Regions:
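Walker B catalytic acidic pair
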Residues: 99
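Active-site-proximal or metal-binding-adjacent scaffold patches in catalytic folds
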Residues: 1-94, 103-141
Length: 141
C-alpha cells in the first residue's frame, strides 16, 4: 500500500511519522501505532481501535476519515477539539493528537482509554485541547 504523505512546512511526512513527531513533542516515549486513511468512515473524523489477530495478539491502529479530513470546502476557521483550525493540515493534526491520547492511555494499560478524566487532563495539559470531542462528524462515547 502506498504511503500517504502530509506536507508540513518544508518536509513531507507519512501519517505514522507525523504521529511519531507528535508523540515525541508530547514527551511520550512510545512507538507510533499504524495510522491509516479510511475511505469508509463518513461520520467520525478519527478513530482509535485495538483488534485481535488470529493468534490472539492485540494490535492498535488509528483510522482517519478520507471523506471528512480531505474535504477542502470547510468554512474557516473550523473548531476541532475546541481549537480554531485555519487549514486542513491543522484539522488533521488536532484529530491525530486526539487519537494519540487514546493510544497513550491504552499503552499505559489504563482501564479506561476512552474520554475519561485522565484523557481530559492530557488533552488540556499536553495539547491545549478545549474539548474532548473532535467537533467534526460524530464520535462514539
Amino acid at each position: 500500500m502506498p504511503s500517504i504523505l502530509l506536507h508540513t512546512g518544508q518536509m513531507t511526512l507519512t501519517l505514522r511519522q507525523k504521529a511519531q513527531a507528535i508523540l515525541r513533542e508530547a514527551g511520550w516515549e512510545i512507538p507510533p501505532p499504524p495510522v491509516i486513511w479510511s475511505p469508509r468512515m463518513a461520520r467520525c473524523a478519527g478513530f482509535f481501535v485495538v483488534e485481535k489477530d488470529a493468534r490472539g495478539k492485540w494490535h492498535p491502529e488509528i483510522r482517519l476519515s478520507i471523506p471528512l479530513l480531505r474535504r477542502r470546502d470547510w468554512p474557516w476557521p473550523q473548531q476541532v477539539c475546541g481549537m480554531n483550525c485555519h487549514d486542513p493540515e491543522a484539522v488533521q493534526r488536532r484529530i491525530l493528537e486526539h487519537e494519540l491520547i487514546h493510544y497513550k492511555l491504552w499503552m499505559d494499560r489504563e482501564k479506561n482509554w476512552g474520554h475519561s478524566e485522565r484523557f481530559r487532563q492530557l488533552a488540556w495539559e499536553v495539547f491545549g485541547h478545549q474539548s474532548i470531542t473532535h467537533g467534526i462528524g460524530s464520535e462514539p462515547d
